[in-house]
Structure formats: C-alpha cells, structure tokens
Curated annotation (Swiss-Prot):
It is found in: Cytoplasm. It catalyses: adenosine(1618) in 23S rRNA + S-adenosyl-L-methionine = N(6)-methyladenosine(1618) in 23S rRNA + S-adenosyl-L-homocysteine + H(+). CDD domains: AdoMet_MTases. The keyword Methyltransferase applies. This is Ribosomal RNA large subunit methyltransferase F. SUPFAM superfamilies: S-adenosyl-L-methionine-dependent methyltransferases (SSF53335). One of its GO terms (biological process) is rRNA base methylation. NCBIfam families: PRK11727.1. Belongs to the methyltransferase superfamily. METTL16/RlmF family. Its main location: cytoplasm. Its EC number is 2.1.1.181. It comes from the Bacteria. Pfam families: Methyltransf_10.
Length: 320
C-alpha cells in the first residue's frame, strides 16, 4: 500500500516471515541433542507441549545457543551475564525482510540452511551490534553477507570477537569497529572508502534505567499471568537482560531515531539503504516525516508480526 509517491507500507499477515524456519515452533528434541545444557530448562506447558520459562534468562540463553548451533551452525554462542538476550526468531525475521528489500534470495533457494559465505557482494553495517552480535552472525550465516558490527562498548565487541573465534567462516567475513563517540552512529565508523548496501539497527527504546526496569517487570508480569502465576517485584528486575546502551538512552527511541536519521544524510552516498527497527508505534510517523523532510528518494515502512507482537522496520535512501 502506497502512502505517498515515495513511501509504502507492506502489511503482513500474522506470523513470521515465510523464509523463517521458526514459523512452526521449536524442535526441542533436536535442540537438546545439539546443546545438552538446554535439557535442564525444558518443561511441559499446560497442554503438554515442551517449552521453557521465557522469564528465566539462563533458559533463554541456553535456547538461543541451541538454536544458533542447530539451525545456523554458529558454534559456542554466548553472552555475558546482564547482556541483552535476543529472541532469535524475531532477529532473523529482520534479516529476511532486509534481504527481500535488497532483492536477495536465499542461497541455493533453500529456506534457512546454514551457508558458507559466498555472497560477498552484499555488505551490511550493524549500528550497535551489542554483546550478542546477532544481526551480523545471522546475516553472514544465512545469506553470506560481509558485515561490520559497531558498538560504543568495547566489552560487548570483545564478546562478539570471542564468538567469532569459534566460527572461522564467520570470522573471515565479519569485522568489528569501536564507536568512540557515544552520540554518533555512522561518523568514525564508515570510512572514506567504505560502501554498505544496507545498515541495520535495533535502538534502545527506553529513556531511562527506571523506564527500562518497569518495561521488564511488565514483561515478567505478562509471562506470569500467561502461566497463571503471580509476579512479584522481588524477581530480578532485568531478567530479560540488557546493558545500559542496549536498553535505554537519554531521550529514548524517538530521539535516538531522530539523531540517526539526521546523521544518515551525510552518508547518503555510502549506504544504499538505511534501516532501523522501531518498537514504539508512536515513533514511526515522526521518523518518517523527518526522513522525507531531509529529501530521501524512497521510504519504506515494513510491519512484522511475531505472535501477537507487532514491530516495524523503517527504511530510507537518498538515491535512486
């Protein structure tokens, strides 16, 4: 559906991207065989199906390690305690939609098989890759893209580097760059001779530590309610994980997007498509309005669904 001459929104039916191998849930038998430590966290839900406690960060971490190893051949993935633990199905969804934006089919025409990095024509920048490095890892493992992950936290980059050390093919195609300026996005990361086909970003969406804690407790409460249990404030307030730069920044998601969009204009000739996740629906239109004001030649708004949760990707470019 076209909203204007240079922008369009793609409405998606409920569910993950058609390329997403996680559309049919998790094969816990295969996952625990691949990563035995997962066994201790598997239990039955009220209807007798295998699941884990998604409010337990250790359980989610073990599930992620198993998923990445089993489906994507990414070995020994881990994150430090307290780091953001990403939901793999949602993260690979973003990559699939970006691949579609770029016109990239899955290598060999197969759905979500682990591939050697042979599609080096595409280069992706992950702004704020975090300690999990998930977008660069998945983009390289599935599509064979060359990737650069940037972050303001040297410890986060050190963790991604340790993961890459156990994955030689990924290590050869993913590089990491420290952003020395916490208020910059592309400056000092994109070098004079760089060209990226696309940039991706998952902004911190809270404006303060207090807001981040309240958001996490809301998630815990909702999970507890779905299990017919009471959530108490005595439970870890950041059980879902996430360090300062990963969860919140001054001004929250809206100001983060505003700054990134403004800075993107200076790198219009070095990035084919700028993209970002937008978690809060009320932040979408202000971002798109600013993008158009800055003279973007094409603007996209992509809606993604993971269960009952709707997220959005905005994409823009300044050249045909």
């Amino acid at each position: 559906m076209h909203k204007s001459a240079n922008s369009k929104t793609r409405k998606q039916s409920k569910g993950l991207h058609p390329r997403n191998i996680h559309r049919n849930g998790y094969d816990f038998d295969a996952l625990k065989a691949c990563h035995p430590p997962l066994v201790q966290y598997i239990k039955c839900n009220p209807v007798g199906a295998a699941t884990i406690d998604f409010a337990n960060s250790a359980a989610v971490k073990a599930l992620n390690t198993a998923l990445l190893q089993h489906h994507y051949k990414i070995e020994s993935w881990s994150i430090p305690d307290g780091a953001l633990c990403p939901p793999i199905p949602g993260r690979i969804d973003y990559i699939h939609y970006i691949a579609e934006l770029l016109g990239c089919p899955l290598p060999s025409g197969k759905i979500n098989t682990a591939n050697t990095c042979t599609n080096n024509a595409v280069k992706m920048l992950d702004v704020g890759t975090g300690a999990n490095g998930i977008y660069t890892l998945l983009a390289c493992a599935v599509y064979g893209w060359r990737c650069v992950g940037s972050d303001i936290n040297s410890e986060s980059l050190a963790n991604v580097k340790a993961v890459l050390a156990n994955n030689p093919t990924l290590n050869a195609n993913i590089s990491l760059r420290l952003q020395p300026n916490k208020d910059a996005f592309f400056s000092q990361i994109i070098q004079t001779d760089d060209y990226f086909d696309v940039s991706v970003c998952n902004p911190p969406f809270h404006a303060s530590q207090e807001e981040a804690s309240k958001g996490t407790n809301r998630k815990l409460h909702n999970l507890a309610r779905s299990r017919n249990k009471a959530h108490t404030a005595k439970q870890p307030s950041l059980n879902f994980g996430g360090q300062h730069a990963e969860l919140w920044c001054n001004g929250g998601e809206r100001l983060f997007l505003k700054k990134m969009i403004k800075e993107s204009q200076a790198f219009a000739q070095q990035v084919g498509w700028f993209t970002s996740l937008v978690s809060k629906s009320e932040n979408v239109q202000p971002a798109l309005k600013l993008i158009r004001k800055l003279g973007a030649t094409e603007v996209r708004e992509i809606e993604m669904m993971q269960g009952n949760k709707k997220t959005r990707v905005i994409a823009w470019r300044f050249k045909p």
